């Protein structure tokens, strides 16, 4: 399977989740073996950051990368789109210190990348494959990874809210199945949003880019895009956070109520024990499967909402 990049540069702008100000982003093609890199405009010039577990400096509201005085926040939805479409090499130019939040999902980034076009390169795709079972747990939340020739996620969430409850999703992540999760938006609770705004945080958060819930209902006038949009978004976040390994990660991941902090802790553990749990693999062209033979998305939702 060959590495890929985009065919041409493409730009967008939008609101930054943290600052509430307009930020600008340009996606550029990149040479083979570049990987995903962020070129961040700062007062001292352009600083480059390549995603890896150790450069994650914050996991509160979103995943933030930082290095040498430069940082870029809210990277996970863009990274999920890049990984979901199996793009290996791309340069992300950022003005404003954040990836724009857009509508709170990855749908706009998928549209941008598809509009830019995807170009096959010459070199073989490099991946890290889970070599043996590994379990990571903290405070009752966990990630279990098993060897698997692909990227499969089984995710469970549980929230004491009548519209969420317990939800599960099982999906093989491919360019064909990624649409199952790409449109799922980030979500939060009204009491949390009000508190964050009072502290000058999440100033760009609104009903335009997040699902907001009170104690019983969704406040967004158009409601949910699917009853299990919540777990779909958690899978989206997980795909984006797993992109921090620098090259695609293959395995079967069974995830219980994780979040950005646990995802990053899991990756740091893998990186520190790479000789035990990871196998570096090149996927030659001969291993590429026709799209029609790729695994389809498999969705299973438990605990249908008590309130429709």
Swiss-Prot record:
Its cofactor is Zn(2+). It catalyses: a UDP-3-O-[(3R)-3-hydroxyacyl]-N-acetyl-alpha-D-glucosamine + H2O = a UDP-3-O-[(3R)-3-hydroxyacyl]-alpha-D-glucosamine + acetate. Keywords: Hydrolase, Lipid A biosynthesis, Lipid biosynthesis, Lipid metabolism, Metal-binding, Zinc. Gene3D superfamilies: lpxc deacetylase, domain 1 (3.30.230.20), lpxc deacetylase, domain 2 (3.30.1700.10). The active site is at residue 260. It holds the Pfam family LpxC. Zn(2+) binds at residues 77, 233, 237. Its EC number is 3.5.1.108. The keyword RNA-binding does not apply. InterPro entries: Ribosomal_Su5_D2-typ_SF, UDP-acyl_GlcNac_deAcase, UDP-acyl_GlcNac_deAcase_C, UDP-acyl_N-AcGlcN_deAcase_N. It is an enzyme of class 3 (hydrolase). GO terms for cellular component: membrane. One of its GO terms (molecular function) is UDP-3-O-acyl-N-acetylglucosamine deacetylase activity. GO terms for biological process: lipid A biosynthetic process. Pathway: Glycolipid biosynthesis; lipid IV(A) biosynthesis; lipid IV(A) from (3R)-3-hydroxytetradecanoyl-[acyl-carrier-protein] and UDP-N-acetyl-alpha-D-glucosamine: step 2/6. Belongs to the LpxC family. PANTHER family: UDP-3-O-ACYL-N-ACETYLGLUCOSAMINE DEACETYLASE 1, MITOCHONDRIAL-RELATED. Catalyzes the hydrolysis of UDP-3-O-myristoyl-N-acetylglucosamine to form UDP-3-O-myristoylglucosamine and acetate, the committed step in lipid A biosynthesis. This is UDP-3-O-acyl-N-acetylglucosamine deacetylase. It comes from Nitratidesulfovibrio vulgaris (strain ATCC 29579 / DSM 644 / CCUG 34227 / NCIMB 8303 / VKM B-1760 / Hildenborough).
